[in-house]
């Protein structure tokens, strides 16, 4: 499928997902909005607050094990000024879901719509690869037992009964990301929320390495054997790994793919891609400005 056709298909998914969310909201008590703890601003679905209106929400920063702990705590402090928020490590063994249940109860109590002792319904929202599926596996005990449609919602997702009480569903489709801002776009590609056809992978990998070099200077030397902490990084990584084209030119396309794969596997360490502060989440050099 060509890039243009793929983009058209993706746009169709986005429209359907947004429409389905609007139809679903009256049937739920709370929205769980999942974002990547490494990029809490960039990976939150744009427009969700407007679409959800006064519906209670809980912001869940997943993959906290891949982010800087102090930075994640700072983000939680900022987010909690508006809505309950938690950070979860969903990888590996059993996750501690206590903070999520507590935040959900808090959101429901704040809304005054439903006492937390009664059955409640939640919808899981977020961009792709932010941790939604892993969260559903954890909260459902890995069973994913569908319990049927909710009255008033004639078509759409099946609901899963939770061991802790309540029901939850994952919104199918793709919520639209914000790709017109480069500082947002490269971070979304780095965390895997969008694909390379949508964002220039080589430019994004260069921006990623610039950010990592600024926050964790020894990481690039340890991983790739780089002696210089100045760009262009892709050329250096390609040369260090022997990824060369005919004539000895650096294969920057292969280097970009390798760097992004390393990052997503956590091989470049625990580095947050955004810190509370500036509107773009980073400095001009890291953002490729």
Language model region names:
Residues 92, 114-116, 126-128, 139, ...:
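Short, well-structured alpha-helical patches and their helix-loop capping segments
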Residues 58, 65-125, 144:
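Canonical P-loop GTPase G-domain recognition
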Residues 111-115, 137, 143-149, 215-219:
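Short, structured loop/turn "capping" segments at alpha-beta junctions
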Residues 122-141, 145-147, 171:
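Glycine-rich phosphate-binding P-loop
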Residues 1-31, 37-58, 64, 70, ...:
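Helix-rich effector regions associated with P-loop NTPase G domains
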